[in-house]
């Protein structure tokens, strides 16, 4: 493997730093839920801010068996959205059953590929945002492989599946103190638990001054962001209800669903509310920071991004298991509400904007106290510091 190096120049352009190998960081992710990938991308950006570090993102499942990975991802999304009780049973079994580790034996080819990648790239540290990797890495160690420390970045809050911590790791990074307490009560030493926050995109830490929602006055339109993740018929029912209010300005994000985009545009024609319909966009940080409220399911990335944008979240859907903890985090910190029907959404919006938006102001202030928008940098700094301590 060819190692990259960097040099610092003097004002006259001559070299002031001897060539030295780049410190390599491997970030392991998977596409089963956007939270894992979102966290991994943020970590990669944070590590790569250091000119002496090169962080590489790897989805082993997509790399080893792309067709199977695409099929299983689609199946996962379909199950959690159309058969939540089945997913709840699966999630509970994964959390409690002592037989779960035996199922990972079917990933032998994934484990061997991971071992080859580590041997080739010789990382100084490994970070993973998906729980299965810790099991594969531990299996490699039992088989005699020797490599750098591995750190687990837990992308769920409060209702944390034991898959995240039932196998060893050099450290665990969690979203909040209560989630840290969950690990400690399950036997993880407190010195290995780091309350860093969820690694959101660096745009949240680098917040531009103009990325603010409009000041709320009697004449200000309330800006509402509706991020549609699943369930077209339910989404259209919510959209119809939102569009009936003249003093609201609605932004819809419909992803890559072109048919849904067109249906939303048709609904918006002549509606009392102002409306903008977006497809897939990478401007989510800006959208969250410039809207007063976001409506969405309680996904890991969406929940944490709303927190770090100081944008109160109305939860329209909860997937049993991991998303229950995400909503509970919002509820405990009084930063949003559960609103699973169009009428509940409309009623809650009217309530939080009443009386000079007193409830909205309270929720936003709570988010500002609770948010950790620089979490990705915190994790990168901690991992690099520990790597230096062991003499890498």
What label would you give each PLM region?
Residues 211-292:
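Donor-nucleotide binding loops and adjacent catalytic segments primarily
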Residues 34, 89-187, 192:
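Active-site and donor-binding regions of nucleotide-sugar-utilizing enzymes
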Residues 286-325:
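A donor-sugar binding/catalytic signature common to diverse glycosyltransferases
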Residues 42-117:
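Conserved N-terminal ligand/cofactor-binding loop architecture of enzyme catalytic domains
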Residues 342, 348-368, 386-389:
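Conserved donor-nucleotide binding/catalytic region of nucleotide-linked donor-dependent transferases
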Residues 170-229, 255-257:
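A nucleotide-sugar donor-handling region in carbohydrate enzymes
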Residues 372-392:
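C-terminal alpha-helical cap of glycosyltransferases
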